Design a protein with these regions (language model features):
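Transmembrane and membrane-interface helices of multi-pass
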Residues: 1-277
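General structural signal for secondary-structure boundaries
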Residues: 117, 179-182, 200-208, 232-234, ...
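Generic detector of well-ordered alpha-helical segments enriched in charged/polar residues
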Residues: 128-135, 189-192, 207, 284-287, ...
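Short alpha-helical interface patches
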Residues: 176, 185-193, 205-207, 284-294, ...
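Alpha-helix initiation and N-capping motif
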Residues: 185-188, 279-286, 303, 364-365, ...
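Membrane-interface segments at or immediately adjacent to transmembrane helices
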Residues: 251-343
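Solvent-exposed soluble domains appended to multi-pass membrane proteins
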Residues: 311-337, 343-346, 350-696
Length: 696
């Protein structure tokens, strides 16, 4: 019926008005054909079962499209009435008013099309975020309006584009429980390759959005196109293109120089992409991450120079650190033994005794001091404190420091890591099974997608810990260690296992620490609210130490070679207040770095060739921990990892705030007077080559 009405209206229009304006008639009929083809496509997809059982939704969608197809030819007649029925000035004012109304309608509808299919918290979105979405959409639609010569098709293209964005986010949410981030756009080919493995099904809300899009198309079919002819037409085309170019340049400058996070305080770290996207809206969240995507290119950078630096540092490593008999012996031993490697990143594990012993009531975390036979131990300096866990694991896996990527970035949510060399991928190439455990939501920090990109074969999240023992903020450390041990006992293949614990997570106001871990400390000048958090946190660390004792005892008794690397991801948030109260008047950089310090150790349950295993101490950045692990156990190393360890001789610790030179002094990256400035710039260049150039 809809098709018949459309054909009849087009034929009637052509017979009556062909001689008066062929291009306008063709334009109207093209709109009718386009909408009718969309209706036909919906019918075919529904018949094929692709659209699921939503009969009512399909019916409304087809009705909306058919209505648009039948009404499109009427646009010409109404436009003629408007042109002939009003004075020229009044007519232009009416056209401008109509254009503005329809443009706003298109912008608002597109906002709904982007958000409604997947955002069940749309009603709670702050007005500022909704307005930001509308402003950004308005700018985009204005540019499309000019680019398409003020015709219907530019606005239709924009509406179709944002409807596609909403659909894509709906399916990504349905399949992966994740938000689309800029790095996903960089890996569209990969996404398309795996899309065939999912079953597509549309919800009632989605059909409502599609119907709204169809009604928008109906409204847009009345949108006036360019009606000038001859020289006037050429002048109008030129003016529109010029305005588009000026606008595009202006938007580009705006995007580069005005950070949305600074204007409306959008979240740049995005630890919970789905939650943040729902609260802020898709468009402000995506734009914020995109603005934070770029890694500064080092001065005088070239691939040839970077490769030369990497090779030179790798050669220096082989001449010095890699030339010993112990090193060659460890390499031969690794090739023969293929030890399993377990990496534990313990949530918020740190030693608050570096600030104070609280009048002698607390001696500090037991590790690494409780492990005299460690291969290596000391402190690492994460780039985050109080939160931002994913950047710590990123630095460990990639050997790249956030110090050279830029502050206020969350690597997992803005970069495609599938082309980056990482520890999981390295061990996978060596024939290892690669497994990750995290007793929480796998979508946090985009981990589910990122772990797959980095080479993990399996990722076990909270759903795999049903019935597990809990402590404080989640599944206990011991429960995760039990899963690791089960894997080591049941699978004889060499394993690379990453265990990200959860129990110590803040906040520390739950008042749920049982005996014998409950603690009560005191400190003159410190408020009770902070002291109560300290009490709860210390109780968590005491329990973590006991669980770690238990785990290491089991590993010692295990009849297979295992290497354990353990580190804390960051300090708890309240240590900033301890630091400010107890250490006033320090230089700012050294003061800041005190809250960027957590314990680590590397240990094995077997004797490693060339290692005294007497608890040697060495502080380092998390970017050096992975390469140092490989070096100690004799595993094959990449040249970039050798380069990191070579430069570590001068740059003892590197994180987002700066670096500690081999003289024990902290320096900022822009301190050109530093005796280690040249080494820092070399590491910046090397890191851009092996990381930055691969993700942008």
């Amino acid at each position: 019926m809809g098709l018949l009405l459309s054909v009849c209206s087009c034929v009637l229009l052509a017979r009556r008005k062909w001689s008066e304006g062929k291009s306008e008639v063709i334009h109207a009929c093209a709109w009718s054909a386009f909408l009718e083809l969309l209706a036909l496509l919906v019918c075919v997809l529904h018949a094929a079962g692709v659209l699921g059982p939503q009969i009512r939704g399909v019916s409304w969608l087809i009705l909306a499209l058919s209505l648009g197809a039948a009404c499109a030819p009427v646009r010409y007649l109404l436009q003629r009435k408007l042109d002939n029925g009003a004075p020229r000035v009044a007519m232009r004012l009416l056209v401008i008013a109509r254009d503005l109304v329809l443009m706003f309608f298109a912008v608002f509808t597109s906002f709904v099309l982007v958000e409604l299919p997947w955002n069940d918290a749309l009603g709670a979105m702050p007005v500022t975020m909704a307005c930001a979405s509308l402003v950004i959409l308005g700018i985009i639609f204005a540019l499309l309006y000019l680019l398409f010569q003020r015709s219907t098709f530019g606005i239709a293209f924009g509406a179709l584009l944002f409807m596609g964005v909403g659909l894509a986010q709906f399916f990504v949410m349905s399949f992966k429980g994740a938000a689309i981030v800029p790095s996903d756009v960089l890996s569209l080919r990969t996404a398309a390759a795996v899309a065939g493995g999912y079953e597509f099904s549309l919800s009632q809300e989605l059909f409502g959005c599609l119907s709204a899009a169809a009604l928008l198309a109906v409204a847009l079919s009345f949108f006036p196109g360019l009606v000038e002819h001859g020289r006037a037409r050429l002048a109008s085309v030129g003016a529109n293109i010029a305005l588009f170019c000026v606008g595009a340049v202006g938007v580009s400058c705006l995007f580069s120089n005005v950070k949305l996070s600074e204007v409306i305080d959008t979240d740049t770290m995005c630890w919970d992409p789905v939650g943040i996207y729902k609260y802020q809206g898709f468009i402000p969240s995506f734009v914020t991450l995109a603005q934070n995507l770029e890694i500064p290119i080092p001065e005088d950078y070239s691939e040839a120079r970077a490769d030369e630096l990497i090779q030179g540092c790798a050669d220096e490593f082989e001449r010095s650190q890699g030339a010993s008999r112990g090193s060659s012996g460890a390499s031969a031993q690794f090739a023969q033994e293929k030890p399993s490697v377990v990496a534990v990143m313990n949530e918020s594990y740190s030693d608050t005794s570096i600030f104070t012993t609280f009048n002698g009531a607390y001696d500090g975390a037991r590790y690494p001091d409780a492990l005299p036979d460690a291969l290596l131990c000391g402190s690492v300096v994460p780039s985050v404190t109080g939160g931002g866990t994913a950047n710590s694991e990123f630095e460990f896996f990639s050997s790249a420091s956030m110090g050279y990527n830029g502050a206020a970035k969350m690597a997992y949510t803005i970069y495609d890591l599938s082309r980056v060399n990482t520890l999981p991928a390295q061990f996978k190439e060596l024939g290892y099974d690669t497994v990750a455990y995290h007793p929480h939501n796998g979508a946090n920090y985009n981990r589910t997608a990122v772990y797959d990109a980095m080479g993990f074969d399996e990722f076990h999240t909270i759903g795999d810990f049903a019935g597990a023992e809990s402590f404080h903020a989640g599944v206990s450390d011991k429960a995760t260690y039990e899963r690791v041990l089960e894997r080591l006992e049941e699978d004889d293949d060499p394993q690379f296992i990453f265990d990200l614990t959860m129990a110590n997570h803040g906040g520390y106001v739950l008042d749920n620490i049982p005996e014998p871990y409950s603690t009560e400390v005191s400190l003159d000048g410190m408020g009770d609210d902070i002291l109560s958090q300290v009490d709860e946190y210390i109780g968590c660390i005491k329990r973590s130490d006991d669980d770690l004792d238990w785990f290491i005892d089991r590993l010692r008794a295990l009849d297979r070679p295992v290497v354990l690397v353990f580190f804390g991801d960051h300090q708890p948030g309240f240590t900033g207040e301890l630091n400010d109260m107890l250490f006033p008047g320090e230089d700012q950089l050294s003061h800041t770095q005190r809250v960027h310090r957590t314990p680590y150790f590397i240990w094995s349950n077997y004797d490693i060739e060339g290692s005294a295993q007497e608890g040697e101490r060495l502080d380092m950045g998390l970017n050096a921990l992975g390469p140092k692990l490989l070096q100690l156990i004799g595993a094959p190393m990449l040249d970039q990892q050798k380069a990191v360890l070579t430069l570590q001789q001068q740059l003892a610790c590197v994180n987002v705030n700066g670096y500690m030179g081999s003289d024990g002094v902290w320096y900022s990256f822009d301190d050109v007077e530093s005796p280690f400035y040249a080494a820092s710039e070399e590491l910046r260049t090397i890191q851009y080559r092996f990381f930055g150039s691969r993700v942008q």
